Amino acid sequence: MSKKAIYPGTFDPFTNGHLDVLERALNIFEHVDVVLAENSQKQTLFSVEERFDMVREVVRDLPNVSVDVLREGLLADYARQAGASAIVRGVRQVKDFEYEFQMSLLNRHLYPEVTTVFLMPNVKYTYVASTIIREVSMLGGDVSKFVHPYVLDQLSRKRAERRAH
């Protein structure tokens, strides 16, 4: 088993597909840091604090998992400072791989000691994307099969807030 990996993402929200990739990573690495990106270029439904709370709640019973936030700077620098030997990325489709492959090459250039590990989720999650979950949930659709009950509650709360405004 390898040492430590980081699993970065926006996780807006954290889905069962994300959880599946994390659990697969724990079969390979001794410890995985789930790292939430505070990406100013992405419009998110949940604040980074809300996303942090959701991920922490979902993974609280998983051993050897921690949750952190990357507020600024490069992921490669974060990986170096964290002592990570790998960056875990979930890949559902070919279009995911194209982008992730480019990012892995850049990260390898910036931090040659890190390896990007691409993991495919269970086939039942290949079409589950946070964007779709957000959209369906905000329109009142049932996404309970795709997210943890705590995340479902937070999506319902957001939907109620939006209706109130």
UniProtKB/Swiss-Prot annotation:
UniProt keyword list: ATP-binding, Coenzyme A biosynthesis, Cytoplasm, Magnesium, Nucleotide-binding, Nucleotidyltransferase, Transferase
Cofactor(s) this protein requires: Mg(2+)
Gene3D superfamilies linked to this entry: HUPs (3.40.50.620)
Residues flagged as site, Transition state stabilizer: H18
Entry's Gene Ontology cellular component terms: cytoplasm
GO molecular function: ATP binding; pantetheine-phosphate adenylyltransferase activity
Binding locations of substrate: T10, K42, L75, R89
SUPFAM superfamilies recorded: Nucleotidylyl transferase (SSF52374)
Entry annotated with the keyword Protein transport: no
Catalysed transformations (reactions): (R)-4'-phosphopantetheine + ATP + H(+) = 3'-dephospho-CoA + diphosphate
Function: Reversibly transfers an adenylyl group from ATP to 4'-phosphopantetheine, yielding dephospho-CoA (dPCoA) and pyrophosphate.
Alphabetical list of HAMAP family matching this protein: PPAT_bact
Subunit structure, interactors included: Homohexamer.
Name the UniProt record assigns to this protein: Phosphopantetheine adenylyltransferase
Organism of this sequence: Chlorobaculum tepidum (strain ATCC 49652 / DSM 12025 / NBRC 103806 / TLS) (Chlorobium tepidum)
Organism classification: Bacteria, Pseudomonadati, Chlorobiota, Chlorobiia, Chlorobiales
